[in-house]
From Swiss-Prot:
Keywords: 4Fe-4S, Chloroplast, Disulfide bond, Iron, Iron-sulfur, Metal-binding, Oxidoreductase, Plastid, Redox-active center. The active site is at residue 59. Its cofactor is [4Fe-4S] cluster. This is Ferredoxin-thioredoxin reductase, catalytic chain. It catalyses: [thioredoxin]-disulfide + 2 reduced [2Fe-2S]-[ferredoxin] + 2 H(+) = [thioredoxin]-dithiol + 2 oxidized [2Fe-2S]-[ferredoxin]. The record marks 88 as: Increases the nucleophilicity of the active site Cys. GO terms for molecular function: 4 iron, 4 sulfur cluster binding; electron transfer activity; metal ion binding; oxidoreductase activity, acting on iron-sulfur proteins as donors. The lineage of its organism: Eukaryota, Rhodophyta, Bangiophyceae, Bangiales, Bangiaceae. It is found in: Plastid, Chloroplast. InterPro entries: FTR_bsu, FTR_bsu_Cyanobacter, FTR_bsu_sf. [4Fe-4S] cluster binds at residues 57, 76, 78, 87. It comes from Porphyra purpurea.
């Protein structure tokens, strides 16, 4: 059973990595200059997707995560991101943000290395 959960998390991690890259390109946003921030946020999204079935924003505190997921407001991409390009997690940054990089991709190896070292 643990092996199945690890496979599921690995699949969700890759899905969230690909989603993040695609969404950044589609919205003209970029990842943080510190790619460990990008990695930790993608990991958090994958963990929530693995545990709850939805990529709930990992950067906020929730009294009831299941209720928040049902409300969908903080499911990534959250409403503030979709409406105003405001990402609380700093996963998707606008070009004028002082912490932005020119990157819209993070390779799988870098992602795994940054997660392992966090």
């Amino acid at each position: 059973m643990k092996k199945q959960n690890l496979v599921s998390f690995s699949d969700n991690l890759e899905a969230m990595r690909k989603f993040s890259e695609t969404y950044a390109k589609r919205t003209g946003t970029f990842f943080c200059a510190d790619n460990s921030v990008t990695a930790v946020v993608i990991e958090g999204l994958a963990r929530h997707k693995d545990k709850y079935g939805a990529p709930l924003c990992p950067c906020r505190h929730y009294e009831d995560k299941k209720a928040e997921i049902s409300a969908t407001y903080w499911n990534c991409p959250c409403v503030p991101m979709r409406e105003r390009k405001e990402c609380h997690c700093m996963l998707f940054l606008t070009p004028d943000n002082e912490f932005t990089s020119d990157l819209q991709e993070i390779d799988k190896t870098t992602l795994l290395e940054k997660i392992a070292s966090s």
